[in-house]
Amino acid sequence: MRKIKRNDEVIVIAGKDKGKRGKVVKVVGENRVLVSGVNTVKKHEKPNPMKGSTGGIVEQEAPIQVSNVAIYNSATGKADRVGFKLNEDGTKVRVFKSNSEAIDA
C-alpha cells in the first residue's frame, strides 16, 4: 500500500515550490507524483494539425519526487506523516501520525 495516492492533498516540503499545496493527479512509477499547480515547466511544442494543437510554448506540470511532498492534514492545517493501522475486520488503512485519524474515509 502506498503512502501517497491519487486525489490526496499534498504540500511541497522541499524545492522551488516549497509551501505550495495541490492534489495528486497521477502517481508516476515508484517514487514520483504529478501534483496540480506545482512544479510547472515550459515545453516547446510543434504545431500538429492532426491533434489540433497550434504549437508554441506550453506550460505544464512535471513530476516531483515523493520525498519532496508530504500529505496535508486539514484538521491540523499542517503537513503530516502517514502510518498504517489494521481495522477490526483486518483491512489495512492509512492514518495521520499526529492524530491517528484515518485518511481514507
UniProtKB/Swiss-Prot annotation:
SMART domains: KOW
PROSITE patterns in alphabetical order: RIBOSOMAL_L24
GO molecular function: rRNA binding; structural constituent of ribosome
GO cellular component: ribonucleoprotein complex; ribosome
Alphabetical GO biological process terms: translation
Keyword Iron-sulfur listed: no
Keywords associated with the record: Ribonucleoprotein, Ribosomal protein, RNA-binding, rRNA-binding
Quaternary organization: Part of the 50S ribosomal subunit.
Cross-referenced NCBIfam families: rplX_bact (TIGR01079)
Family as reported in the entry's similarity comment: Belongs to the universal ribosomal protein uL24 family.
Function per UniProt: One of two assembly initiator proteins, it binds directly to the 5'-end of the 23S rRNA, where it nucleates assembly of the 50S subunit. One of the proteins that surrounds the polypeptide exit tunnel on the outside of the subunit.
Name listed for the protein in its UniProt record: Large ribosomal subunit protein uL24
